[in-house]
A protein has these predicted regions:
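Rhodanese-like catalytic fold shared by cysteine-dependent sulfurtransferases
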Residues: 1-20, 27-58, 67-106
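Short, surface-exposed ligand- or partner-binding patches at beta-edge/loop junctions that are enriched
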Residues: 62-63
Length: 106
């Protein structure tokens, strides 16, 4: 499974790279803290809503710590999803710690 760190993601976003961010946490978690520009597709809905993920774009999937996002990537791969998928190492917690301390931790 491909991975990307929060710092690497920030550098790529700042450079203007066209990266799709998918957040697989629950709606209450998303409303509390989110990475700007991310789209919420909770893990339990990922299979039903997989067509909302643009396979032509590099996609970074994240959750709180990286576990649910890894599950989401495995599920998508099992269905034959062909796009480039990366797991955000440490999830939104790493984003808050390493990139943007204004993103609340829980």
């Amino acid at each position: 499974m491909q991975e990307i760190t929060a710092s690497e993601l920030k550098t790529r976003l700042d450079a203007g790279d066209d990266i799709q961010l998918i957040d697989v946490r629950q709606p209450d978690e998303y409303s509390f803290a989110k990475i700007e520009g991310s789209k919420l597709i909770p893990l339990g809905e990922i299979m039903r809503r997989k067509d909302e993920i643009d396979a032509s774009k590099e996609t970074v999937i994240h959750c709180k710590m990286g576990g649910r996002s890894a599950q989401a990537i495995e599920l998508l791969r099992k269905t034959g999803f062909q796009g480039e998928l990366k797991n955000l190492v440490g999830g939104i917690t790493a984003w808050s710690n390493d990139v943007d301390p204004t993103v609340l931790k829980y």
